[in-house]
Structures are given as structure tokens and as C-alpha cells.
From Swiss-Prot:
Region of interest (Promoter-binding site), residue spans: 249-256
Protein name, as recorded: RNA-directed RNA polymerase catalytic subunit
Segments of skewed composition (Polar residues): 55-64
Key words, A-Z: Eukaryotic host gene expression shutoff by virus, Eukaryotic host transcription shutoff by virus, Host cytoplasm, Host gene expression shutoff by virus, Host nucleus, Host-virus interaction, Inhibition of host RNA polymerase II by virus, Nucleotide-binding, Nucleotidyltransferase, Phosphoprotein, RNA-directed RNA polymerase, Transferase, Viral RNA replication, Viral transcription
Organism from which the protein derives: Influenza A virus (strain A/Tokyo/3/1967 H2N2)
Gene, per the UniProt record: PB1
Amino acid sequence: MDVNPTLLFLKVPAQNAISTTFPYTGDPPYSHGTGTGYTMDTVNRTHQYSERGKWTTNTETGAPQLNPIDGPLPEDNEPSGYAQTDCVLEAMAFLEESHPGIFENSCLETMEVIQQTRVDKLTQGRQTYDWTLNRNQPAATALANTIEVFRSNGLTANESGRLIDFLKDVIESMDKEEMEIITHFQRKRRVRDNMTKKMVTQRTIGKKKQRLNKRSYLIRALTLNTMTKDAERGKLKRRAIATPGMQIRGFVYFVETLARNICEKLEQSGLPVGGNEKKAKLANVVRKMMTNSQDTELSFTITGDNTKWNENQNPRMFLAMITYITRNQPEWFRNVLSIAPIMFSNKMARLGKGYMFESKSMKLRTQIPAEMLASIDLKYFNESTRKKIEKIRPLLIDGTASLSPGMMMGMFNMLSTVLGVSILNLGQKKYTKTTYWWDGLQSSDDFALIVNAPSHEGIQAGVNRFYRTCKLVGINMSKKKSYINRTGTFEFTSFFYRYGFVANFSMELPSFGVSGINESADMSIGVTVIKNNMINNDLGPATAQMALQLFIKDYRYTYRCHRGDTQIQTRRSFELKKLWEQTRSKAGLLVSDGGSNLYNIRNLHIPEVCLKWELMDEDYQGRLCNPLNPFVSHKEIESVNNAVVMPAHGPAKSMEYDAVATTHSWTPKRNRSILNTSQRGILEDEQMYQKCCNLFEKFFPSSSYRRPVGISSMVEAMVSRARIDARIDFESGRIKKEEFAEIMKICSTIEELRRQK
């Protein structure tokens, strides 16, 4: 069917067609190989932007550090990181003047959070740099390893389970002359396989103790590991992102909590809200500017882009901001919050895996680890890499590069938003003291600036003043990439505004389709995504109906569950045909069992099992929802599950969907190949951790789940809980006397074992 594409747009306003220009169909690009080159680019660029700052040497680690703060004022339009302390402090003071009590109240809220946060807050998040093993690990494992090492080195504050006490341990650990850690290593040896009589390589995993002196420990504690950012659309070059270690994370969390509390009270901040709430907030600012620009005034909006936001921000500036924001607060609070920026101004960037070399002629491959880059002969590298290495060499220590200026991606999003908003705040007439004034929106490094003035010259003057003010605090608006329009049309954080926000539907495209969790969850997630897009993203009824049909088709191909009466032959068709023939009420079969689809756009909110329950044969119901079915590893039945859906940009979103556990809710088994690698020890630790947590939650079901307060350990808490429950059960006649006695005996045995240990 030939369609002239222009016909599709005849009835569509131009702004609604914007989504067709987005690069969001198909697979996003992933990075392969090492991120070392990208990291070196980041380090070198960051130093270049601050090159006229002062060099000093860190007395503890010996790392050379560049400090651009209060450096020369820029004379051209090149990006630079020379923020002026007094300007930043003044911007903060004016922000407080416009919002009386904002800092005071945010500090009080944050203090409350600090008192209550448990150390398990740090188990959230994905990959974390594990300083004990010198590589990335899941957050929970990295935390467990850190606590284990702290404990074996005599640091015990964290036993209480409060995050603030764990942070006390971190501070104390930095004063220790040495730290003893346990590292994993693997031995390879060649042995003869008894079955095949061939020689095979056998790997064994060992744990060994290692001592780190103060300098080595500090370097590791201040290290951010780097990786390449994956799945970034619309970019030609990849870039590096950082994962901090456990020593830094807790401090960053508290600073961001404070900044988040401030952002919530600022009408120009696009964080921490999202979705429709964010759109409403933004629409308010635009409305204010348009109503206030009387008939005599012009109003223009800049869709802004900042050059290398992170690399021109400076942790020393953040320290100044925090010092000002917390100025009337208790000493302990000020100290806790100032540690994150101090650690960041002494941070080290780990260069990743290093480079892979291969010789085609000799069929040889060799890995050059990052640690060797300081000493290796540069003749092996190509021109561009050679330049990078030469530039970074003075900064290298043990395979990490000293990186004092700059922030690395995504570390202080909230706090840097506060800085951006403080400049937008200066646009009020009482501060500009002239005929032009401005306002706008800021969300991390993205901004929209609305300027009002009586004439075009006034608009130009306002933009120039904004541009220069930004320069003073290390923000570099890009003149090449920002563009200006009559107010009413602009883009901000991929929301397109044209007299109201236009749905940018293409952004949601990647989340349509079959997730690949299991038959039950996939069906549920698929229809929920369509339902949500009808609510939030202008997905019209006809398109939604089509999306639904495409989804069902996709689903059937994925799980090979075509209708029982189909001609399509797959591995499953024989079984499904048999089921189809022996089913009396065919309308009751689930799609995944070869049934037909009952969904339409009116009933997307009903789980498929519920939709078809009344139509099912009785024996089919019995097989489908049978908790004793031995082939299904059942999770406990929750009424609502969370799926991770990938929007086109921004982090993966969590989306709720209704979950009805059936024999289709299977959990796939883990890949076995991990068991032969050095990860095996870690996997065992992880399973152990998981088992302990599961056991603990059996004793404290969520309804009565109060975290044990005070110093009792998990075991003590469980034993005392078991005793209480047993006594209640015995007195109410739910258990016999013998059972009660047996429980008491087990509890005593456990306590005895703990005492002996």
C-alpha cells in the first residue's frame, strides 16, 4: 500500500509532528569495549576549561589539583569554570530574600531525614564502585563488603543501622594508618578432565588479606569508577559516567536531600517533580510571563543549552553554597553536609579497563590495564590516543587520574539546579533595575529562559546580562545551540511547548512491546503501557486499538502461542492444538495458552485472568491458579508489581501493573556460566544476604514490620519475636504444648551458639 507521507500530516498541526523527528525507534546504540578513552577525554576537557586556575598538591595522596575558583574573568565566549565565590554567595542571598525562610526550613526537614535514615538506603542503586575489590558490584554487595571490612578494622558505629553512624565510621577510617581488606583472586591451573581426557583450565577462587596504607586507602575512598553511558540516542560519540564508592554515596545523599527540599519550594525548578506535575509547574511560569507582558511589552523565550555543564561546575562552589545555606545551623549538620563537596574536590577518576591491543598477523590479543598507561611506551598508540595519554600523565596515580574541578555526570543534579535557579531569580525587575526582566525554568543542566522587554534591543540586553551573570558562577550558555522564539513556543527537557505542552509520543515508543519477564507479567505490562499512554500522552483511541493489536501479535510471536486453530507451525503448536481441542469454553483460554484476545481499549485495566475467569472451564481454572503446581516457583502474590520500563531518555521508570499469579508467572533460572568465574564468591555472598533478608521478613511480616531499634542484632530480634509469637499461639491454642517447647528449645540453642561464637 503506497502512502504519500505528506498526506499523513495534512490535518496535523506542525508542532504535533515533532515526535516523528525523534531518533527513538529501533535499538539504541550500546558501547562495547573499554571506556578508558572517554574518561580520559572527560578529565582532559575538564582541566582545559579551568586551565588558568592555580595548581596545588594534595598533601595526603600527592595528587596534583587544579583550582579555578575566583580565577580570571572570561574575555571570550569559550566555556570556562572560573566561578567567583562572592557572586555565588550573593546569588544565594538574593534567592533567600525572594523566598524568606527557604533555607532554614529545608535544613530542618533535612535534619529530620538524617536522624531517621538507615544505612540500607545505600543498597538502592545499581552498580557501585567496590573499593575492597577495586571494581563495580551491585550496591548491596558493595555495602556489605565495606561494612565487613570496617568491622574487621575495629570500626563499629554502623552496628546501630543509622546511615549517619556509618558515615562516622567512614570519617574515622580516613584517619587510620592502615586498613586490612579481603580481596578475591583467581588461580588458573591446567588439569586433565576424567571424562573427556582433554586438558582443561580450572579456576579456583581464593580470598586473601591485603593491607592498604593510609595513602592507598584514601585514593580508593575518593575514587569514582567510570563506565560508558549506554543506550544514548541521537549522539554520535559515547561519553563516560561515574559510579562513586560507598564512602562518598552517603554524604552525597544527604546533600541532595537538602537540595531537593529547596528545589521543591522553587517555582522555577523542574526537579524533583516529573510527568504531568512538572508540566503544570512549567505552564505556570509561562502563564505568569505572558500575563505580565502588557500590550507594550515583547516576550521571547530561549530554548537553552549549556556547554559541558558538569565539567564547568566546581565542588568548591558547592561547598560555598552549602556553607551559606546552613549558616545558622548546628555544627554537626554543617560538617556532615560539607564532606561531600570536599571529597569531590579531591576526587580521583578511575580510568576503567584500559586498552585492548591485537595483532592480526600473530593472532595475539593483550590488555593494557589503566595502571600501565603512566609508564608504557607511546609508540603503540595512534595519534589521538597518544595525545590524550600525554596530557593526562601528570595526573595519574595508580591507574586513577586526579580530577579536582568538574562534577562527573549526575552527581549533584539537585544542588546544581539550585544554582541555576538562583540566576533565574535575579531577573526580577527589582534586581535588574531597568526595563527588561527575565524568568525561566531549570532542571539540572537544561533551561528555558523567558525575557520580557519593551523593545528588541531590550530583549537583547536582557539575554546578554543573563549570559554574563551565568559566566560568573561557572555556567556557560551555548550561543550556538540555544535559540530564541516568541514566547509560546519552546522546548524544555524534551517537553515541547506550543501554547500548552504537546505530547511527544515518540519518547514512549521504546516502552511498547513485550518485556520478556514471563507470560503473565508481559501481558499485564503491555496493556498497562497502552493505558498509561492514553491517559498521559494523547494516544488516541484508534491508535491505541492498533497498538493493542500489534502488541498481541508481538506477544504471540514471542511466546509462540498462536491461536489454537491457526496454521502457523511452531514448537508449541502441537501442545496448544491439543489444549484447544479439549477445551469446552475456548473463550476462556489465555492468549499465552493459544486463546483469543479479549482486550479492547475499554478494559485495559483488568488483568487477563480476571477478564476471562467466568469463561474458563473449571479444570482449566484449577490448573491455571494452582499454588501447588511443582513447575512454578511462585513469588508471594502481590496485588501490584513494579516493572521497569525504558522511556526514550532519562532513567528507567518504574511502572506499576496488576499482577495475578498463575502458572504463567514463572521465574527464569540464573545463567550458570557465572558459577565458573571470579564472581562466584560474590554470588554466594549475595545469595546468603538474600536468604538472611528473606528469613528476617518472614519473622516481621510487612504489616508489623518495625525496624529493630537499639542495638539488637537481626538474630536477637528474630529470636525474641519467635518467642513472643510462640507464646501467643500456645495460649490461644493454635499450637500444642510439645511444639511450644520445641520452639523454645531451638531459641535457646541459637542464643547458646551465638555466645560460643
